[in-house]
């Protein structure tokens, strides 16, 4: 049956609008992840990932993810998917990160690699397409990295995007669009957006300062000048310090022994400081000279900054001082709405229960510490009471001994008298 052209085009449009999921990983099949994720053998001491939902969670099964398990280690683990290009379509990269160890220094980001990556040799210098996610190291570094590899060079964003630094699970989303715009979301809320060309130094600047232009010699940028008619008053110059007129030489001052007496100095009440002529508006003031700009002959627009020929591997290539971070709910798609919905159905469903469990644990820990502190104080008081009791018994014994000695002495004296 032949369909009318408008209906056919509409159906084709609906088909084209279906989201394409290139990669999705939720770790819902137990140890099955070990068949999909490859450990790099580039170094023999890479840290190990384990499957865990952590010490607290919203749903013990749904919140299971890859957790770093060894302190002060590099980690290198990756998963491959069917290669694709994002040319002509949006790219959405999304995952959750949970720093339940209250991380002090370590990465929580992912890298997207082209198809040519040797997963068993993946390491920190392996060339990637995009690096995205949180990075924390001390109080000075708490940022979201958004790094693109452009013509073989890793280019960092010019903006500072602050990441979450608490112990709970957070959803990170990067959207790269075919119009060379981007958006970064945390917990499904936009935290940054803009133009790739404006916020990264992919290209030379459109404008440069005219090399042939220079500030005219008579260009006066001084807004104020000294008043040429102003002059210093004749009585202006006074010393800053003067001898104290109330000081007197001590009566016992011996000039042969102590030298010539000089009175101490004090601040001169008539001292006025350095004289400066008053300021007036400069009649020759022309404002700040602005260097004229010209079109940069080195600049050439690139409509395909956003595009990569091949995405095929998602990798966790990072360093952590204190382990315990959990990665979960990985998603790579071409559909922004689908990614937002997926985030709400995963992180969004369990986040409240996760916090409730953590709050309950914290309250139980607080009560336990209070009880331990109470018990410790009671034991200390009991020990003090026991010591006081022993001291009292010793005093009583000493008193009894003293009384006995006095009685014996009295008896002896009476005997002598007899």
Curated annotation (Swiss-Prot):
* Residues covered by region (N-domain): 18-197
The record's Gene Ontology cellular component field reads:
cell surface; cortical granule; cytolytic granule; cytosol; endoplasmic reticulum membrane; extracellular region; sarcoplasmic reticulum; sarcoplasmic reticulum lumen
Positions bound to Ca(2+) = 26, 62, 64, 328
Amino acid composition bias (Acidic residues), ranges on this chain: 252-261, 380-409
Binding, an alpha-D-glucoside? 109, 111, 128, 135, 317
Q: Where is this region: C-domain?
A: 309-418
- What outcome follows a substitution of residue 170 to A? Loss of activity
Q: Which SUPFAM superfamilies does the record cross-reference, listed alphabetically?
A: Concanavalin A-like lectins/glucanases (SSF49899), P-domain of calnexin/calreticulin (SSF63887)
Q: What does the entry give for GO biological process?
A: ERAD pathway; protein folding; protein stabilization
Which positions carry N6-(2-hydroxyisobutyryl)lysine? 64
Give the residue ranges of motif Prevents secretion from ER: 415-418
Q: Which positions make up the signal peptide?
A: 1-17
Segments carrying the region annotation (Disordered) are 193-277, 349-418
What Pfam families does the annotation carry?
Calreticulin (PF00262)
Its subcellular locations are:
Endoplasmic reticulum lumen; Cytoplasm, Cytosol; Secreted, Extracellular space, Extracellular matrix; Cell surface
Q: What is known of its domains?
A: Can be divided into a N-terminal globular domain, a proline-rich P-domain forming an elongated arm-like structure and a C-terminal acidic domain. The P-domain binds one molecule of calcium with high affinity, whereas the acidic C-domain binds multiple calcium ions with low affinity. The interaction with glycans occurs through a binding site in the globular lectin domain.
The family classification in the record reads: Belongs to the calreticulin family.
Q: What's the stated role of this polypeptide?
A: Calcium-binding chaperone that promotes folding, oligomeric assembly and quality control in the endoplasmic reticulum (ER) via the calreticulin/calnexin cycle. This lectin interacts transiently with almost all of the monoglucosylated glycoproteins that are synthesized in the ER. Interacts with the DNA-binding domain of NR3C1 and mediates its nuclear export. Involved in maternal gene expression regulation. May participate in oocyte maturation via the regulation of calcium homeostasis.
Output this protein's name. Calreticulin
User: The organism's lineage?
Assistant: Eukaryota, Metazoa, Chordata, Craniata, Vertebrata
